[in-house]
Amino acid sequence: MKKDYKKLELDKILDLLSQNAYCDVCRERIKKIKPSFDIDTVRTEIAKTDDAFTLSSKFGTPKFYNIKDICFGAKRAQQGSSLSLRELMDIGMFLREVSGLDDWYSQCSGIQTSLTEYFEQLSVNKHLENMITNAIISEEELADSASPQLAAIRRSIQRKSLAVRERLDKLIKSQSTQKYLQESLVTMRDGRFVVPVKTEYKSEISGLVHDTSATGATLFIEPMAVVEANNEIRVLQIEEQKEIERIIKEMSELVGSFAEPMINDYEIVLTLEIYFAKANLGAKMKAVTPVI
């Protein structure tokens, strides 16, 4: 049978079809499609592809994205695990696609097709979609708007950090101090503000040594005048991390509570994308619906 597939160049057709899909998972599924020899199945598949073509011709092709497989993350969240920001971002992108497909299909109201059941099964979740989209900047950072508490903590860190910098700026600009410094700058070591002091003058700047240069010529000292303020900043940074973990946990729990409908939607989205990919390829090839 595989030899017959090769003679028919099925692999080349499937490769062309995969190029009309948007997500990697969908492309891989397309390449694994096998012909059916059941006439009812064949007729059903042709009808769905034909309906996708008709809808695309009237309303344009719905927008698909390169969504990632969200099933594993959704199941982990369902079991109580906190997800990574990357996993949450992928889920947010997926939920946006579900919303987009639902919006697109709303313009087709009143038109019944063999694809109607797929669209009507989609579970739009704007609350979770907006929560994730508004809270996450990147896979490494939450937005200040993720929670009022996070925003307040970060404002406090910013204010206290600015005060420490201003105090150290005065120190490094003082003529009596400059001769002890390797450079007139404020830098960071171990998350604390320090100044670069020449090793031979370490006793002239009272403070805590956090690091040395590769050559040993410079000590990075945290002046005693800012130790307490740096401690306060560190406490705030710990509070910030705890709040970040709380927010991620809250979003993960919400994802877990909707895991089953999301996994169902994921399969529906991939199925729809394949039918519209077939319709797009058919349009490009100026293909005609076969009569069986």
Predicted regions and their residues:
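Alpha-helical coupling/stalk and coiled-coil linker elements that connect catalytic or binding modules
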Residues: 1-61, 77-82, 113-114, 129-292
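Long, charged all-alpha helical bundle/coiled-coil segments in cytosolic proteins
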Residues: 3-7, 51-122, 127
